[in-house]
């Protein structure tokens, strides 16, 4: 790794899903998962808004890829800095162009959102009764139970995930509470695969997400059925 960093002139899992190999989460910065066309490496000196200078983990000299169209189409996620770990998808028809760039070092970290609870079985009531119930409810009750909760996850460099704001198991007090929070999956592992973000749970397989936006303080992911935004949490 030291030699790779010098070349750049700066610093330095098992799941199942359709069309994804069972060992695709066994991530290595040197050895890619089977079927993954993503290139992994380091950002080198010379990266600009129009090109990325990239040193692949496989070795060799730095390669310059054009990213003008990728940036125009919103497919450059994060700003490559010298020594940052990157994931690239190269245009199969033009080996000098990257179609997608992900700054893995900017993607890592703790990402959260604030969720409001709702009263149990409220959805089963007609909307008119829901509005009446909320209007007639004393403010003291609302303040006691309608408390926002911060939930999220930390993407670690080891490709593991630490949940944020989630208990290991449901408690009796949770079941007795008149409110409930949106259910959150407890992800355990993550990786990039063909430009997608794979999030794996222990019991429920993988969720595949596409990155919509990645900024130092903001992450938006597009899942199969929704888009979810997160803010970066520096300490928790």
Language model features: what each stretch is:
Residues 73-87:
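Short nucleic-acid-contacting surface segments enriched for D/E, G, S/T with interspersed K/R
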Residues 106-108, 182-186, 216-236:
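Edge beta-strand at a domain terminus
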Residues 4-7:
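C-terminal motif of bacterial Sec signal peptides marking the signal peptidase cleavage site
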């Amino acid at each position: 790794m030291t030699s790779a960093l010098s070349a750049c002139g700066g610093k330095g899992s098992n799941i199942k899903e359709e069309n994804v190999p069972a060992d695709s989460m066994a991530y290595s910065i040197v050895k890619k998962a089977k079927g993954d066309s993503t290139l992994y490496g380091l950002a080198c000196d010379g990266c600009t808004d129009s090109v990325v200078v990239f040193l692949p983990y496989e070795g060799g000299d730095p390669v310059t890829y054009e990213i003008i169209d990728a940036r125009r189409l919103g497919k450059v996620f994060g700003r490559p800095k010298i020594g940052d770990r990157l994931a690239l998808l190269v245009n199969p028809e033009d080996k000098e162009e990257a179609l997608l760039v992900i700054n893995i070092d900017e993607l890592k970290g703790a990402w959260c959102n604030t969720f409001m609870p709702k009263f149990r079985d409220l959805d089963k009531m007609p909307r008119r009764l829901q509005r009446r119930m909320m209007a007639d409810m004393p403010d003291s009750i609302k303040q006691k139970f309608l408390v926002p909760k911060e939930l999220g996850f930390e993407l670690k460099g080891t490709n593991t995930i630490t949940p944020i704001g989630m208990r290991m198991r449901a408690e009796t007090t949770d079941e007795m509470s008149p409110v409930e929070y949106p259910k959150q999956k407890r992800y355990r592992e993550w990786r990039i695969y063909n430009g997608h973000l794979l999030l794996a749970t222990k019991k429920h397989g993988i969720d595949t997400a596409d990155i919509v936006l990645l900024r130092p303080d903001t992450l938006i992911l597009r899942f199969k059925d929704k888009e979810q935004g997160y803010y970066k949490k520096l300490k928790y």
